[in-house]
């Protein structure tokens, strides 16, 4: 909900729509509890918060909620581990998590979020690009990617490709590292 309303607040087709979306966003934000949200719910909410904060930079409340949600999400990522994911299973739309942290880093200028996002994106590369210069291979939903196992190879979700393209493009914007631009291009092929 916050994702859609945040974007509608910033990019709605006309001013009345943007005002209505902003009012609905503020109402929905009052019910958002980062401490109760799962990692993917927080990732989606952070995308909406980012859009809203960019459209309304003078409002401190949404910016602080963004920071709180990003802190909690980044804290869920294991440090010093090969498995850089907040749980034992990677499922669909996994690129949204590093994307959300990259957007949070952009919104509030906190490099900790950027570094956490890049670690997570490198982790996801192991499943999505198992061959260094090979094509994108999405994690299948017929088993997903469980810790200690190979990623499932069948029943991939198209939503995964869009999230990864956005995450790789955001990583390139944040770092100007051509690696990420190359991954974004490969993921669209």
Task: Give the ranges of each region predicted by the language model.
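Glycan-recognition and catalytic cores of secretory/periplasmic carbohydrate-active enzymes
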Residues: 2-189
């Amino acid at each position: 909900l916050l994702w859609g309303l945040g974007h509608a607040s910033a990019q709605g087709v006309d001013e009345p729509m943007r005002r209505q979306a902003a009012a609905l966003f503020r109402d929905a934000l009052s019910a958002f509890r980062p401490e109760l949200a799962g990692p993917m719910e927080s990732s989606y909410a952070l995308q909406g918060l980012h859009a809203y904060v960019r459209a309304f930079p003078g409002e401190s409340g949404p910016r602080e909620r963004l920071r709180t949600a990003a802190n909690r999400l980044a804290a869920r990522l294991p440090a010093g581990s090969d498995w850089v994911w907040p749980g034992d299973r990677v499922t669909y739309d996994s690129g949204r998590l590093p994307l959300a942290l990259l957007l949070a880093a952009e919104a509030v200028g906190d490099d900790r979020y950027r570094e956490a996002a890049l670690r997570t994106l490198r982790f996801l590369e192991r499943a999505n690009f198992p061959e260094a210069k090979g094509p994108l291979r999405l994690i299948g939903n017929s088993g997903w990617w469980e810790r200690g196992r190979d990623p499932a190879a069948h029943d991939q979700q198209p939503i995964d490709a869009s999230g990864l393209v956005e995450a790789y493009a955001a990583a390139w914007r944040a770092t100007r590292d051509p690696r990420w631009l190359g991954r974004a291009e490969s993921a669209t092929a």
